[in-house]
Amino acid sequence: IYTRKFTANIAKRKMDEYGHPDDAVTTVAPWPQQTTVGPFKVGFLPMSHSIPESSSLVIDVAGDRLIHSGDFKIDMTPGVGEPYDPDLWADVSKDGVKALICDSTNVFSQHAGRSEATVGPEIEKLLGTAQGMVVATTFASNVARVKTLADAGERAGRSVVLLGRAMKRMVEASLETGVMKD
């Protein structure tokens, strides 16, 4: 298992939880570092998304370059994790890319995605004016949204409570790996 620091933390926790040795998990640095796996040279190209340290894979094999990206979000101000870097992508592709393989959840939407930075002030307004307790839900892996909610809650003078094992595990991993500072 080759992965960046945040995902390695989560993977090692899972391996330990199920009694498997965690030395199967290899932590790699982001691009331009590449790892050789069989005939492939693979680099982890930072790509903004709701999950910290998301990466597209730059795969060099037999003189060709392929780029494989899971879901992505072009966000210049993601709040957590690296912003999308068009210059880095231009540099990686300057000598040509044989194939770009990707998917995007909102590919058919006519609207540009919102940056996480634009969501915080709106959430803060809602939390500041709401009466009584406010409950917000999100995927535990959406660390950027968890941080946005926590920061907005704190600024609005509210107490923030995390519920759920996965939510706590993701926040712990974020703090341990430096993805979140507070």
Model-derived segments and their meaning:
Residues 1-182:
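His/Asp/Glu-rich metal-coordinating catalytic cores
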